[in-house]
Every structure is written in structure tokens, then in C-alpha cells.
């Protein structure tokens, strides 16, 4: 079904967020239903199994916040792993760093990559052709299990909300395996859901990472297309995590290519934890 104008809604606990426009593609992959719609305000937007994943209008709120706090603060960043990220946005932000030698993108659903390359070209752009990128159509959990110890400097978990095929990406055992394959000073960076719409999942992620890693920090910002509009990203490490330790010359170069992220934005975002979340984490 293509080029049919209609409303497409995401439903969440008695509420809904919808976009009206032309449906460019609607198909069922092995894992999920994939829809791309063209909306007057948000531009092209991607929905997976009834949940909005990204749009051309606001995708940089998500991708820049996931990537740059980790990569701008770690000295050694040769090997990077992205789990999920089939729209190409996380890859695009990673390739801005010349020190990276290799990026492994592990996406379970090849159709997401194909459709993103065709209908959401503005997101991945030329990053799809970067020589450092290797794309693996594979299960992220299985990939991590078969990876040797201390291999990756940074791991990005850029996955959808918990579902039948992604639940294990939020599990205790998976985070422990990620810790195993990280270098001693490596950083795990993960989207950690909304403190409002997915509060229980959010709390569970934060508590789990706090128990597994020596230190973890969470930042909050806006992704308008997501339920409640507020989202979070959590960064964890087995060593001291100093996300304010920056190479300022490098930061200035990166900031120039960003629409949302800069160092002041980041520093403020790490101080935005709602008090109700603090209370639950301390209980």
C-alpha cells in the first residue's frame, strides 16, 4: 500500500499521537509491521509495530543525545558497536569521529535498513557508505554473546521499546554480557525509555545498570514524536565515568555539525532527573 493519505496513530494507555499524510510504504517483515508516512510538519516518519521510531523533524533530538555524551568524553574509541539503529541516525553521528576505526551495526530486521535507506535517506545519508561501517543482520543478544572480552570501546543500544523480540535487550543478563565485552574504560550508552510514559521500565533499566556497572548517569531531553515527549539515555561504565571531561577542540568541531547537542545542553540534561524518579531509585 503506497501513497494513501490517512491518519496513523500510536496508542498508549488511553492516549494517542497521530500523524496525517501519505503512507509511502506499509509492509510486514519477519519481525514487525513497518510504516513510513509523509507528514506536513514532521516530514517522513517511521513506525514499527504501532510505535513511532523516528521522524525527519525530530530524529536529531534522539540520535545526538545517544551518541555524543559517550564519544566526546572517552579517549579511546577505536571499536564501536551499535545494536539496533537500522534507520542510520546513530551511525551518522558516530562517523563524525575520526578516531573510530570500526563500527559494527547489528540490526535484527534487514527490512528496516532497506526501507530507511530508500525512504529516510536524509537520516543515514552518506554514513551508510563509510568504509568503517560493517552491517550485520543478526540478533544483538547473540552477537554480544559470541564477542570476545574487552573488545568494544563504546556500545550503543539503539533499540525499540520492549517487545517480543527486543525484551532481552533490557535484561540483566544482556547488560552483564555488554559489560564483559567492553574495554575496562568502555562506555555503554542506551536509550532508557520515558520517565513518564514508561516509568516502570525506565526505573528498572536505571537500577539494573547501577547494580552491574560501577557508575551510571542518565540524561533527559525531548523527542516530540515519542509518548509524553520526554525521553532518557543512560551511560554506564566499569571505571569512573566523567561525561564532563571533554576534548574542547574536538567538541567545537562536533557541535558545528549538530542541531541539538552541545556541551551546555548536555550538562543541563544530566541535571533534569525528576524528583519522583530520584525517590524511587533511593527506595
UniProtKB/Swiss-Prot annotation:
Alphabetical list of PROSITE patterns matching this protein: PABS_1, PABS_2
Ligand binding (S-methyl-5'-thioadenosine): 32, 107, 139-140
Keywords: Cytoplasm, Polyamine biosynthesis, Spermidine biosynthesis, Transferase
Domain PABS positions: 5-238
Annotated active site: 158
Binding site for spermidine: 63, 87, 158-161
Record-level GO BP terms: spermidine biosynthetic process
Principal location: cytoplasm
GO molecular function: spermidine synthase activity
A GO-annotated cellular component: cytoplasm
Protein localization: Cytoplasm
Reaction(s) the record says it catalyses: S-adenosyl 3-(methylsulfanyl)propylamine + putrescine = S-methyl-5'-thioadenosine + spermidine + H(+)
Entry's EC annotation: 2.5.1.16
SUPFAM superfamilies named among the record's database cross-references: S-adenosyl-L-methionine-dependent methyltransferases (SSF53335)
Xref: Pfam families: Spermine_synt_N (PF17284), Spermine_synth (PF01564)
Subunit-level organization: Homodimer or homotetramer.
Family named by the database record: Belongs to the spermidine/spermine synthase family.
General function of this protein: Catalyzes the irreversible transfer of a propylamine group from the amino donor S-adenosylmethioninamine (decarboxy-AdoMet) to putrescine (1,4-diaminobutane) to yield spermidine.
Name listed for the protein in its UniProt record: Polyamine aminopropyltransferase
Organism in which the protein naturally occurs: Prochlorococcus marinus (strain MIT 9301)
Amino acid at each position: 500500500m503506497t501513497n494513501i493519505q490517512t491518519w496513523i496513530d500510536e496508542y498508549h494507555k488511553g492516549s494517542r499521537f497521530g500523524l496525517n499524510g501519505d503512507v509511502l510504504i506499509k509492509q510486514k517483515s519477519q519481525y514487525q509491521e513497518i510504516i513510513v508516512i509523509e507528514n506536513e510538519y514532521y516530514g517522513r516518519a517511521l513506525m514499527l509495530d504501532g510505535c513511532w521510531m523516528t521522524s525527519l523533524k525530530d530524529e536529531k533530538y534522539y540520535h545526538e543525545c545517544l551518541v555524543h555524551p559517550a564519544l566526546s568524553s572517552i579517549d579511546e574509541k577505536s571499536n564501536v558497536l551499535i545494536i539496533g539503529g537500522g534507520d542510520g541516525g546513530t551511525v551518522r553521528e558516530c562517523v563524525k569521529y575520526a578516531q573510530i576505526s570500526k563500527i559494527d551495526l547489528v540490526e535484527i530486521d534487514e527490512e528496516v535498513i532497506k526501507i530507511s535507506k530508500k525512504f529516510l535517506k536524509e537520516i543515514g545519508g552518506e554514513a551508510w557508505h563509510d568504509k568503517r561501517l560493517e552491517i550485520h543482520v543478526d540478533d544483538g543478544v547473540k552477537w554480544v554473546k559470541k564477542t570476545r572480552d574487552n573488545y568494544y570501546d563504546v556500545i550503543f543500544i539503539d533499540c525499540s521499546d520492549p517487545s517480543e523480540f527486543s525484551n532481552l535487550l533490557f535484561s540483566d543478563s544482556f547488560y552483564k554480557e555488554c559489560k564483559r565485552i567492553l574495554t575496562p574504560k568502555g562506555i555503554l550508552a542506551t536509550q532508557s525509555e520515558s520517565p513518564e510514559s514508561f516509568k516502570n521500565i525506565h526505573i528498572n533499566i536505571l537500577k539494573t545498570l547501577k547494580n552491574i556497572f560501577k557508575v551510571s548517569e542518565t540524561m533527559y531531553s525531548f523527542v516530540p514524536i515519542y509518548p509524553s515527549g520526554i525521553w532518557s539515555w543512560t551511560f554506564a561504565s566499569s571505571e569512573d565515568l566523567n561525561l564532563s571531561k571533554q576534548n574542547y577542540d574536538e567538541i567545537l568541531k562536533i557541535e558545528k555539525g549538530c542541531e541539538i547537542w552541545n556541551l551546555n545542553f548536555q550538562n543541563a540534561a544530566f541535571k533534569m532527573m525528576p524528583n519522583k524518579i530520584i525517590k524511587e531509585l533511593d527506595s
